[in-house]
């Protein structure tokens, strides 16, 4: 079965056909390090790490570029407010993002370019746009001429977001010298006290959109397979990337993939709303692999509504996989099931893929209970293969090395708690409510919360 992905550009499911057979090229809009990473930031990293892992598992050689926007208005403002040099400020938080990605088992990118290291490529890109008649210099800045581009044959401006030009607001603060209200800055003229770089049009610094076109095409070529990012980047950032890239003569990305937000009480997690939960804060509640499991458990195009209950339920789900594999112990990864493959090839339907993993875990536990060790090993090998694609294989060195003692302790605890839960289930079936309540209360006194679900009871440690 061929991988089908939802292409935002065409608003349809499309078969993935890489430009070069056996290879895949992916560009992901990475961090703008201005503050501590929160779980909304890293959801994108986890979502497209799963895409990358699935392509690798299919035998493709994947070139994966994730940029760092290390200069922009917000970084300069934050650094100034805190009395710190801008480069020190951004370096501090870039390290925190790297730490967060590593904690969650996100594979390092093939290359992680910084905007400030690619000014030469940006200058070349701007010159091409000026030569083609789609950009102009004005008082030290360089702007993209939206009117000229929309009037050009083959222009598709607005097609990604579905917006009409007259409805678009670019949010640019610079207006001096702009020919049109919708034009956006490719290069911003130097201001006193701000960092700047020399160009033929004057000293200044990069505009937000230009950097990604320049870096993506520098490392992946003028045409590459997939461009990824958060839904909030669809407009204006990705729309403008497409415009300037096509206007420069590049085919750019063949597929566009966007992950949805993490929300709290229906609101997008955002620093401006004050509803963010930092990665270190969440890791006080669960292990890194459990947070990864949680962030990857919803479909990447679905909103992920955060609640502590949902986080702990996801952690309990991971522990069920972990407990089974720990009981089977020494087993190599085998082959995933057909159901898992069909789910992953259906636009990365991770909820279905996880459901298949848990189905196999139940079968494996039944085999162990029946004394069929060979069958249990066969199932465990399949479970390892499937969990590895999602980056949550409990027997992977990443998780064994980082939490070996926690892993064995939790697995042993799970065996004991499951025995108590089985006793409670039997008591409830016999309408022996006193015994059922006694088991629940004893677990609660030990710091364990029991939640009844359609698939049976789950448990989680209280904070």
Curated annotation (Swiss-Prot):
Residue numbers binding Zn(2+): 29, 212, 237, 241
Cofactor comment: Binds 1 zinc ion per subunit.
Swiss-Prot/TrEMBL GO biological process terms: cysteinyl-tRNA aminoacylation
Enzyme Commission (EC) number: 6.1.1.16
Placement of sequence motif 'KMSKS' region: 268-272
Signal peptide: none
Cofactor names: Zn(2+)
Any Pfam family: CysS_C
Gene3D superfamilies: Cysteine-tRNA ligase, C-terminal anti-codon recognition domain, HUPs
Keyword Protein biosynthesis (UniProt): yes
Cell compartment(s), UniProt: Cytoplasm
Domain of life, source organism: Bacteria
Record field: catalytic activity: tRNA(Cys) + L-cysteine + ATP = L-cysteinyl-tRNA(Cys) + AMP + diphosphate
Motif range ('HIGH' region): 31-41
NCBIfam families: cysS
Quaternary structure annotation from Swiss-Prot or TrEMBL: Monomer.
Protein name: Cysteine--tRNA ligase
Source species: Corynebacterium diphtheriae (strain ATCC 700971 / NCTC 13129 / Biotype gravis)
Gene: cysS
């Amino acid at each position: 079965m061929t991988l089908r992905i939802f292409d935002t550009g065409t608003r349809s499911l499309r078969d993935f056909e890489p430009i070069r057979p056996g290879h895949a090229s992916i560009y992901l809009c990475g961090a703008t390090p201005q503050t501590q990473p929160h779980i909304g930031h890293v959801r994108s990293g986890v979502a497209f790490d799963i895409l990358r892992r699935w392509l690798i598992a299919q035998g493709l050689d994947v070139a994966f570029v994730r940029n760092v926007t290390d200069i922009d208005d917000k970084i300069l403002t934050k650094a100034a407010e805190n009395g710190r040099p801008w480069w020190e400020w951004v370096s501090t938080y870039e390290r925190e993002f790297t730490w967060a990605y590593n904690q969650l088992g996100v594979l390092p990118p093939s290359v992680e370019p910084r905007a400030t290291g690619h000014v030469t490529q940006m200058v070349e890109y701007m010159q091409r746009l000026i030569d083609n008649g789609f950009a102009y210099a004005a008082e030290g800045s360089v702007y993209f001429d939206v009117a000229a581009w929309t009037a050009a044959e083959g222009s598709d401006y607005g097609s990604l977001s579905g917006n009409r030009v007259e409805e678009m607001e670019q949010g640019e603060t610079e207006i001096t010298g702009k020919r049109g209200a919708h034009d956006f800055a490719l290069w911003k003229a130097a201001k006193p006290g701000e960092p700047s770089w020399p160009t033929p049009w004057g000293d200044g610094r990069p505009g937000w959109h230009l950097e990604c076109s320049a870096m993506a095409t520098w490392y992946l070529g003028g045409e590459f397979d997939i461009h990824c990012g958060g839904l909030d980047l669809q407009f204006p950032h990705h729309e403008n990337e497409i415009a300037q890239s096509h206007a420069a003569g590049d085919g750019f990305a063949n597929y566009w993939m966007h992950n949805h937000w993490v929300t709290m009480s229906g609101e997008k997690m955002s620093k401006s709303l004050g509803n963010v939960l930092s990665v270190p804060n969440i890791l006080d509640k669960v292990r890194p692999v459990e947070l990864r499991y949680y962030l990857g458990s919803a479909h990447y195009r679905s909103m992920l509504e955060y609640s502590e209950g949902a986080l702990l339920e996801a952690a309990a789900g991971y522990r069920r996989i972990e407990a089974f594999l720990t009981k089977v112990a020494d087993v190599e990864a085998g082959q995933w099931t057909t159901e898992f493959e069909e789910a992953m090839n259906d636009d990365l339907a991770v909820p279905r893929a996880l459901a298949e993993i848990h189905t196999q875990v139940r079968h494996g536990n039944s085999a162990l209970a029946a004394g069929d060790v060979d069958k249990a090993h066969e199932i465990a090998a399949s479970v390892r293969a499937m969990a590895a694609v999602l980056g949550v294989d409990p027997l992977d060195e990443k998780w064994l090395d980082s939490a070996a003692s926690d892993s064995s302790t939790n697995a042993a605890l799970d065996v004991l708690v499951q025995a108590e839960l089985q006793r409670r289930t039997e008591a409830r079936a016999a309408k022996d409510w006193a015994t059922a309540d006694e088991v629940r209360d004893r677990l609660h006194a030990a710091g364990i919360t029991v939640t009844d679900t359609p698939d049976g009871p789950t448990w989680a440690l209280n904070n």
